[in-house]
Amino acid sequence: MSVQDVLWIVLTVQLSFGLAYFENNQRTQDYDVDKNGSVHHKNWVRNEMMDSLGLYWLKWWINANENSIYFEVTVHTRGFAGLGFSKDGRLARADMVLMWVDDATGHPNVLDCHGALHPSSGPPLQDDTQNYDVLDGKQNGTHTILKFKRKIETCDPFDIPLSADTFKVLWSIGENDPIHGNLDWQGQSRGVKALQLFSPMFTKNSHSIEGIQKWDITVNNVTIDRSMDTLYWCKIVRLPELTGKQHIIGYEPLLSGKYERNVVHHMTLFECQSKIYSGSDPSSWDLWVRSAGTVCNSNLLTPRDWDSCSTPVAVWSLGSDGQFLPPHAGIPMGGASGVSYYMLEIHYDNPDGKESVDHSGFRIHYTPNLRTYDSGILISGVSISETQLIPPGQKKYRSVGICGPSCSSVMFPKDGIKIISGTLHSHQAGRTISLRHVRSGKELNPIIVDENYDYRHQKVHQLANETVVLPGDYLITDCSYETKYRKRPTFGGYSTKEEMCLTFITYYPKIEMSGCYSMTPVREFFEMFRVYQFYSLNMTDVENMFLYNSDYTDYSKQAKNATNKPNSGKTSKEDVIYQESLLNKLVISDPAEFHDRTFLSHLNQLPWHDPLFTKRVEQAFITGTHMTFCRVSKDSLSIPSEIIRYPEFTAYVKPPAACLNYLFTDNEELRSGSSQFFTDFTLSLLLLIQLGLQTTLL
């Protein structure tokens, strides 16, 4: 074995424990506790393996006093390393930096660059202003290590201002040092990884814990046929034998096959209250444990008792690595008051018509060494229903889900709950999601904001500063969608071609609440579009179909059949969704001008191309009435639903950008043009301001 091989093995072992090679790291993660009992994590350090082989490691941390972010890269090369930040993962317009240690002099170099306007325009371009400061760098026979920093906001039009959003972090490895004048990024290896740069991240090794055990929960050979575009599959499992109460400290996904070929879109593990329904046979649960499972949310196939499986304990979405909790909180399992059964729900998304057999699930990490607080997960946002509507052809259209005082005043403890983290969830049209917080008529700082949401990269947003939510507070999940290239309305639903607007909130102390949702009241939804009655169905029947997932055939024996069928030709999967939609079965009788038209057909004829009309619809849905639901763990619906108006409050105003040039960062053409434009514009603006002041003084 060569000396280089030995060094490589040593480096790999060190990195596996989150240590930086050749570095004496003085930062020790700690935390403060404020007067409300909320934890504020300080001095945290993130360390991420950027590739699948451990050739490129990126470490970073925030220095809030300096408004700076520090980076350290350790790369298996004696050539160059590239690092970049992008909203969409493309090299074009990316904020980039090239790094290397000169082979001749040993001098470390960090070069601030940006991607050309078009990828075909050539290699990255050097920035006029260099905003990365190199701190240290060295190399040995196999590896290059560089440490550098930059301001979070540099006021350079070619640098992306860093934030809590999800960024696509680009990386590249080159065999040789860059040749003078040649900034070619295309090295021997390159890739992209979605990261949240402002979030700490906890792992099994964040704090020394003895006695950690694992529990693997998977489905058994679920077959996904080519014809299945969307499938929700549920499997009941029994808690393993435990010696008293334990704490779940984290969980990871167990995915079948390679990531790029996997059809698993979303997974949730729920607690089941097996004694919730009178007359239920307790022995049925053990029978279900031995079965392979069945289709979820089916009136015909899903046992009614499974409705009691409503409290999440583990959540995974596409692009996530799972979650580990901070050292003072753990999700309880087992013990005298714990549940015995859990339900694993897996959402399969199969748009390409693949045939596969799946055995995915979770690996649960737990310990008998109990932590200070019992933690829980609750779901908040828009109730999944076709009453959530997103018009076609929209660059930005918002929907909101409200968790209001009907839940928080009743279920939250006097001192409130403390939010640890949140997973934001929508489907393909989602672009921006935030979890907003309102108290006493004033909106506080948003708890979570991701203005660069990507449904393919739904990582947990771990909070550096926990947020207290008190009884009487509102939580508002606010989602923005883009449907520029869609020709028909998009509705709320379970397929990725339909939409959701949810936040999975991890918090403590645990309360007996699993969900807090809202939706547009059914009657108001139809009246919004001047529809008041359907053939042979009164509006109460229609409301029941939406609220309780009732079968249309139970109400429609006398209903008029005027289903809107797609045009002749090949039927797309979107056509199938529209054909099966309840809105496509409801035939309008009042008003007369719309009679004999399905409600779906009626929606398709509305002037969605008119921005004033669409804006009125958006605002009417947001500021109008909302039906709120408080789902309690011990009962399927113990707190009655309530119809409320959107709360009146003073909205939170984001602080103005510290940098003038950032006013134009949304305009990609300007941002990627010549920096001379910004220089000229800034000088002109300053001159105008000076002239204005002189005029005022005169």
Curated annotation (Swiss-Prot):
Alphabetical keyword list: Copper, Disulfide bond, Glycoprotein, Metal-binding, Monooxygenase, Oxidoreductase, Secreted, Signal
EC number from the UniProt entry: 1.14.17.-
Glycosylation sites: 36, 140, 221, 465, 538, 561
Swiss-Prot/TrEMBL cofactor(s): Cu(2+)
Domain DOMON: 54-174
Disulfide bonds: 272-309, 403-516, 479-501
Active-site residue numbers: 232, 425
InterPro entries: Cu2_ascorb_mOase-like_C (IPR014784), Cu2_ascorb_mOase_CS-1 (IPR020611), Cu2_ascorb_mOase_N (IPR000323), Cu2_ascorb_mOase_N_sf (IPR036939), Cu2_monoox_C (IPR024548), DBH-like (IPR000945), DOH_DOMON (IPR045266), DOMON_domain (IPR005018)
Pfam families: Cu2_monoox_C, Cu2_monooxygen, DOMON
Signal peptide annotation: 1-20
Enzyme class: oxidoreductase
Binding annotation for Cu cation B: 425, 427, 500
An annotated GO cellular component: extracellular space
Cofactor note: Binds 2 copper ions per subunit.
UniProt GO molecular function: copper ion binding; dopamine beta-monooxygenase activity
Location within or outside the cell: Secreted
PANTHER family membership: DOPAMINE BETA HYDROXYLASE RELATED (PTHR10157), MOXD1 HOMOLOG 1 (PTHR10157:SF23)
Similarity comment: Belongs to the copper type II ascorbate-dependent monooxygenase family.
Protein name: MOXD1 homolog 1
